[in-house]
Amino acid sequence: RNAVAAKMQDAHELRCGSVAAAERAYALGYASVALETICDATQSSDAKPLDWGEPRDVETLKTAPRLRLLKRLTVRLDAPRMSVPQKVLNAFDIVAVVPETDDAFRAACSCNDVDLISVACGARLPFAVARKDVEVAIKRGAAFEVSYAHAIAQPRSLRHLTATGLRLAALTNGGRGLVLSCGSPDTWRVRSPSDVGALASMLGVRNTDGVVG
C-alpha cells in the first residue's frame, strides 16, 4: 500500500467531504476525486467508505471520461501507534493520518499502512516536523499533505500554512512527496489546479505539475 503518488500520478486529485464538492472539482478540471471518511483512532475499527449516493446523484461523475472516484480514510491519531484492522484498510484506496502529538507524527511516518501524513495548517502544529521522520516517510513512499481551506478566509491560518508548507517543501527536496489539498466539503473553498499550483510555487515547490488538489 505505499506510494500514494502512484495512485494519483498524471492526474490532479481532490479530497472531498461531499458529492457537491466532487462535482465542482471535476468541473474545475480534476481527474480524480476522493470522498473522505474521517474518524478518531478509537473509532477506526468501524470506519466504512462513504456512499457516493444514488446513481442519479452522481451520474455526471460516474460517466465522466478519465475520472477516478476514490475512497479515502482519514484517522486522527494521538497515540504512538496506529491500530486499524486490515479489513478496514482494504476497503479504502487511500489511508491518511492526522497526527496530533510528536509520537503520533513519528508513528504515521513509519507505518507502512499510511499513504498520507495530513498536517493540519489552521493553527500552530502540536508537534515538531523532524527531518529524520520526514525522511523515513519519503523513503517508504508516503506523502505529506497540507490543506489550504482554512487559509482562504483567515489571515492567521495563512501564516501557519505558509510556515508549515515552506518547512515541508524544504525537507522533501523541493516538494517531492508534498500534496496540497482543499480539505473541506464546502464547494466555494475548492480552487482550480492552476490556483493550487500557484500556491505550491509560493511554498517553494519546484515542480508544480505533480499531485495537487
Where are these regions (language model features)?
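Hydrophobic/aromatic-rich structural module bridging two neighboring secondary-structure elements via a short loop
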Residues: 80-81
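Extended, charge-biased low-complexity segments
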Residues: 27, 62-77
